[in-house]
């Protein structure tokens, strides 16, 4: 009986401990345990790396990205530093997951994707190509080579929304001297 009284008396204190912030902290620490195991396996378990993980503003996204790099077999100190310092980690994570889903994620595609100047339009382009079943190594290379990728991404979006994203239409967009004109045309037809 005494135990139940003590439990009831301490219940408000226990409820105070179970806050959203504490729950997030516990989840991030459990993710950190898995990452620490991976780091140990890859011989990159250092105080500096663990501290960088703990202080990162987006620990869950960082953990997912590290696990993905490990899964693909390209987790090393150099790639870890790139990921830790990247300002658009959420976009990087989504893009790498897209590449991994279609089987074209490797060290080379990692370096090419992360060195691209416009990550958000690149991620969107890859997403729409994947949705249409057209994300191949060749199409990935085509998208990477484009200087003006934003109109490409928008064109792919409008073609996808209209159910007309085909390899032929994709190649037409790539060949067009002013892909932004395609965007305006597709948008006009979509609105009418």
Predicted regions and their residues:
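Ankyrin repeat (ANK) tandem alpha-helical domains that serve as protein-protein interaction scaffolds
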Residues: 1-192
């Amino acid at each position: 009986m005494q135990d139940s009284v003590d439990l009831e008396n301490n219940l408000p204190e226990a409820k105070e401990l179970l806050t959203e912030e504490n729950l997030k902290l516990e989840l991030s620490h459990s993710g950190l345990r898995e990452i620490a195991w991976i780091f140990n396996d890859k011989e990159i378990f250092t105080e500096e790396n663990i501290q960088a993980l703990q202080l990162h503003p987006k620990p869950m996204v960082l953990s997912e990205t590290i696990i993905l790099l490990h899964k693909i077999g390209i987790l090393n100190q150099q790639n870890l530093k790139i990921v830790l310092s990247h300002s658009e980690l959420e976009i990087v994570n989504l893009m790498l997951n897209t590449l991994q889903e279609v089987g074209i994620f490797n060290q080379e595609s990692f370096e090419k994707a992360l060195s691209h100047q416009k990550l958000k339009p690149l991620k969107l382009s890859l997403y729409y190509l994947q949705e249409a079943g057209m994300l191949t190594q060749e199409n990935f290379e085509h998208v990477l080579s484009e200087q003006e990728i934003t109109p490409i991404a928008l064109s792919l979006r409008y073609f996808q929304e209209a159910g007309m994203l085909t390899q032929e239409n994709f190649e037409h967009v790539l060949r067009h001297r002013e892909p932004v004109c395609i965007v305006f045309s597709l948008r006009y037809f979509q609105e009418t």
